[in-house]
Structures are given as structure tokens and as C-alpha cells.
UniProtKB/Swiss-Prot annotation:
<keyword id="KW-0460">Magnesium</keyword>
<keyword id="KW-0234">DNA repair</keyword>
<dbReference type="InterPro" id="IPR013840">
    <property type="entry name" value="DNAligase_N"/>
</dbReference>
<dbReference type="InterPro" id="IPR036420">
    <property type="entry name" value="BRCT_dom_sf"/>
</dbReference>
<keyword id="KW-0479">Metal-binding</keyword>
<feature type="binding site">
    <location>
        <position position="458"/>
    </location>
    <ligand>
        <name>Zn(2+)</name>
    </ligand>
</feature>
<feature type="binding site">
    <location>
        <begin position="52"/>
        <end position="56"/>
    </location>
    <ligand>
        <name>NAD(+)</name>
    </ligand>
</feature>
<dbReference type="InterPro" id="IPR003583">
    <property type="entry name" value="Hlx-hairpin-Hlx_DNA-bd_motif"/>
</dbReference>
<dbReference type="GO" id="GO:0003911">
    <property type="term" value="F:DNA ligase (NAD+) activity"/>
</dbReference>
<keyword id="KW-0235">DNA replication</keyword>
<dbReference type="InterPro" id="IPR010994">
    <property type="entry name" value="RuvA_2-like"/>
</dbReference>
<dbReference type="Pfam" id="PF03119">
    <property type="entry name" value="DNA_ligase_ZBD"/>
</dbReference>
<protein>
    <recommendedName>
        <fullName>DNA ligase</fullName>
        <ecNumber>6.5.1.2</ecNumber>
    </recommendedName>
</protein>
<feature type="binding site">
    <location>
        <position position="146"/>
    </location>
    <ligand>
        <name>NAD(+)</name>
    </ligand>
</feature>
<dbReference type="Pfam" id="PF01653">
    <property type="entry name" value="DNA_ligase_aden"/>
</dbReference>
<feature type="binding site">
    <location>
        <position position="169"/>
    </location>
    <ligand>
        <name>NAD(+)</name>
    </ligand>
</feature>
<dbReference type="InterPro" id="IPR004149">
    <property type="entry name" value="Znf_DNAligase_C4"/>
</dbReference>
Amino acid sequence: MTATHRGAQADASAPAGPLPPEAAAKRVAWLRDELDRHNYQYYVLDAPTIPDAEYDALFSELQALELEHPELQTPDSPTQRVGGEPLSAFDSVRHRVPMLSLNNGFADDDVLNFDRRCAQGLGRTAPAAGEQDLFSAADAVEYACELKFDGLAMSLRYEDGRLVQAATRGDGETGEDVTVNVRTIKAIPLKLRGQAPAVLEVRGEVFMYRGDFDKLNERQAEAGEKTFVNPRNAAAGSLRQLDPRITAKRPLSFFAYGLGELQGVDRPPTHSAMLDGFAALGLPVCKDRAVVKGAQGLLDFYRDIGQRRDALPYDIDGVVYKVNALAEQERLGFVSRAPRFALAHKFPAQEMTTIVEDIEVQVGRTGAITPVARLKPVFVGGVTVTNATLHNEDEIRRKDVHIGDTVIVRRAGDVIPEVVAVVTERRPDDARAFVMPTACPVCGSHIEKLEDEAIARCTGGLICAAQRKQALLHFAQRRAMDIEGLGDKLVEQLVDQGIVRTPADLFKLGVAKLAALERMADKSAANLVAAIDASRETTMNRFIFALGIRHVGEATAKDLARHFGKLDALMAADEAALLEVNDVGPVVAQSIAHFFAEPHNVEVIEQLRAAGVHWTESEPVAKAPAPLSGKTFVLTGTLPTMSREDAKELLEAAGAKVAGSVSKKTDYVVAGAEAGSKLDKAEALGVPVLDEAGMLALLAEAGAAPAQE
């Protein structure tokens, strides 16, 4: 529960020495209330007010007092989350109000038809088939929209505000009693806040944040234990542990989204009001929700969430629409085992099963040998996937991937498809294990694997045509020399026909030679020659990045250019001198020194200079503390006078880190026009928000001048 500031800490200091029973009872009550309050601030408000160490001290004090005064221990105490003795089996629980599944929709027409059915069921004039938005604002049905979490459905029963039972969905009528395990989940309150109903059944989802899932798998791997395929499997497996002490160690979370049995108070008028009520009682409720009208409102919500899906910190597989008014939900009722008033609008699946037809290896720019699974085509993540990376030989062995296996393939957003697990029970008798080749499939050079590296590499260097092709593509990319028009197919022809062997050869190309190549004509050849000619004027950091030195990315290239000022100074630097550069460690320093010690590389650089490649050099900048070092910024929206990339360069030049998402660790958000959810989250977390002028003023105050290329 990391925080950047402390809240009010009345009575926070632990008393010295043993307490008499009456004082102990008061102290225990205060500690429980204080720990419950901090859990609420952390899990519901997402705004913690004390650091982890202080929370742990309060928790330890409560544990000690309950041990000293066992008569004060109660089932809803925060100390009771640690888990008790293992169970032999889970008991069955019959749901008083069934936990029904939802009908699914996959296309826009499914949503239009759902809206039409709801309107007709409520006696409103519905649009004709294939049409939408024919309602007046008064006629359109109001819906509550929320996320469809990819976790495990759960029912929590509270009596007089205290958690008495937790059960899985099961078949909807009967589930399993997992109360002892659920009590270990810190996000779920053991006691509700405020005036709680006599009976409240809360429906929601137990899930795992992606970051927590990654850390769990790291711990599992370090301990030599089985890792989990995805967060959903991890959440389900953790919750169904017979030993609650294991569950207590798993980073499970929870969001409330529905209502079961309710006694002692009236039902709220709307679904959205119900969720607000849950939050007031201390239950975690997802903030990514909206109330909309009509089919167009539903589709707009779906598309907005779809665009932000990969940036969310947890997995979802769609969105859920519910008629907002609970009275209207009752009027619409149910059909079979699903409510008429709700629809789950699914996203394209991000995981599917298919068959590994072969495993081949690809050779990268630095000689890295990467095994790639050739797959039976499968539609996943919105595209047809035929290949998936297997990363390296160790990863193949760890996942036990064989040719012929049925595997689970995952593709999320722009992420390269990967094989995440093997369905071993479907392995055919003729499945074959992968054997890493000892010679490069492109040039025949020896493949070596160093002891401290997972990746095997071709030793051929630029003798290897595959490495030459990748090196040329890297050299020409937009963020390097920016040679527009030099793509994969053209580079392949230039290398295969022996026209280009090094980047310097690009500057010898003429229109006639290029026009003779496949898919090239005089105009496109002339355009490419012009682009190559324009690239002669560049910047030192772009040139360094274009060289393709292993471990040297854009940020390191900028640091090197800024530190040395002149290329000759960089080329002459030994490892000790390189270690003086910001963020350059021993591995990177060794890689740079080895690159410039290779005569062939120096020869290519001199050929490039002779071809007219040039930049403005400057005096070296002594290493100094970066004024914004340690600060994390997030950029969102459109800035008035510069691109976000320009703003990022300014901030990074001042030592700041620029992140892609807002969290409690973010120091500033720089927001321009049409800033989206990042701005909302910053305001919710209390992160300072700057406009472009504010960012520039902060840079000026810190003495950080704009980076010079």
C-alpha cells in the first residue's frame, strides 16, 4: 500500500508496555477501524494515505494484542485474512437468487437488436430492423455500461454488515463455499462501512491485475513451481485452493457489479445508483462505467473501451449493457436462463487454440536466432495468425512445445502473437521435439550461445545476408536515418543481388539501377534516391542509433551524443569512459567498445562520412545530475505547439522518465486538448496536471534547456 503522503494519524503511536483489558479492547477497536479505513482508501478510492511500513506496523500491533487477549479476536478482524487450516473439500452452496449467465453479442447488429427488444418490451416505439437512433431523447432506453472482467464470478453474503459467506457461481443454482479463501482477499471488506442492510448479497468478479500476475509467475518460476497461463487461470486456481494459506499469498482483487438477495432496505432505483451504494459501503467498484441512452450510446462505449483495452491494468473480454432502471429490468424479466435486460458484447478473442505445424528459426539484425512456430491459421485478436514467436530454445523447453502440438496462442493489441501454453492431452503420437540448429540456416556460420544468455546467435556478422537485411532496415527506419521508401522487399532484392552489402552502399545507388528492380519504376526510383540524398544531413544521436549497436536504443544514443559531442570521441572511448555516460552500465559499455573496436565497423562509418553523411557536432557535456531525474511524467492529448514525441524528448533530456500510463507513482501528467482517461485517472489520484506552458515552466525552473539535435 504505497503512498506519497500520510493521512491524519490520531492515536497512531503504539502504547508502551502491556495494556489492561479495557484499554486493550479500545485499542483493538481503534486499530481495526484504522486498518479498515486504510484498506478502503487503497482498494476502493485508490488513494492510500500511509506507506506500507506504517500499515504493517498497525497490523502487527493488532496481531500482538489479539494474541495477548484472545477473547478480543473476532471473525471480521483484518488479522483473520491470513488463512487457517487446509480444507478436505468445498461445501456446496445453493444461491438464494440464481447467478445467471448473460446472452452474448458479437456484432453491431446484435446490439441494435438488443436495444430494439428492450424498447419493445418496455412499450416504446422501436426503430425498424437495421435502423437506430430513431428514438427521441425521452423514448431512448437508458443503459448502464460496464466492463466484462475475465475472472471468476463470486457471490458475497453480508449479514448486518459482516461477511458471512462467499460462493462461486457454479452452475448458477449451486456453487462452492469458498468463504475461508475469500476472507484472505484484502480488496474484499470483512465488514461494510456505514449503515449496512440486514442482508446484502453482492455479485462480482475475483480477478488478478496483470502486474500482480507477472510478479506471481516470477515467484513461481524462482521457486521451481508451475507458472500460470493467464491471470484468469491464476485467479481461479488461487481461489479454489484447499489450503487458504496459499490463497492468502496470491494477489487477488475484486470488483462488485451486481445484487443478489437484499433485506432491510429498499432496492435502489437504478443499477448505477446500486454501484454507487456499493462503493459507499466500502466495496471496490470499477470506475470505467457509464450511463448512456440508446444503441448508439452502447456502441460508442464499446468502441471507447475497445481502444483502451490493452492499456487497462486487467484483462477484460467485452463490455456489459444493462437496462439501468431496476423496475424496467423486472418488467423485461428473463428468457431461459438469461436476463432480457442485459447483454454481454464480446471483443474478438485474444486467446485461441491451434496446431504447431512446424518450428523454424529466424535470424535478427544482431544475429539473434529466434524460433518461430508456424501455425495452422487461426483468427485471434481480430486478425488471422499464422506465426507466433517462441523467443528462444529455453522457452521452448520450459513450455514443452513440440511440432504437432495443440497450443494456446495469444495476441493482444499490437503485441506479437505468442504461444502461451501447450494442451498436452491433445499431443499426437507423432509429435516431434524441436532441435536447435548448430549452423545458421541463412549463411551456414556457427551458432553459439553464451553461458549467461538465453539467446543463441549466428556468428556470421555482416557475412550473413539475414543480418545484413535487418541491419539495413534498421539503418533506414524513420527514427534512424529516415530513408522513406526503403522497405523489406526492396532490401531483400538489393542484398540478394549483391548490390548492397553495407549501409554505405545505399549512397552509391542510382535511378537506373533501382528502376531495373522488381516493382520499381523511374519515378519510385527517383523518389528513393532523393530520400537517400536527404538523409545525408542527420543528427549525431540518429546516426549512432542507425548503426545498430547492440543494447543501444534511442535514449542511449541521445545520452552518448550529448555526453561526447563528437563521434570520434565516442569511437575512441574505452569502457571506463563509457561508464561515465548517464544510464550506461557494464554490459552496454562493453557492447559499444566492442563495436568500435571492430575494423569493419569503423570502415563502414568512414565510408558513410565520405558519402556525405554529416551532422552538427558540439562540445561534450560533462555528466551532471539531471534536474528531473527520478520524476515520472505521462503525456496525454494534443499539445498546442509541439508533438508528444517532442515533449518526451525535452523531458527525457532533463532526466525524467516518460511512462505510458498513470499510476500512484506518476509525478506529473502533461495534458493537451482532447485528453482522455489518463487525465481522469490523474485527477482521481491527485496527480498534478500541467499544460504545455506549465511543463516548459517546470523545465525552465529546473534549468533544463531543450535538447539540441
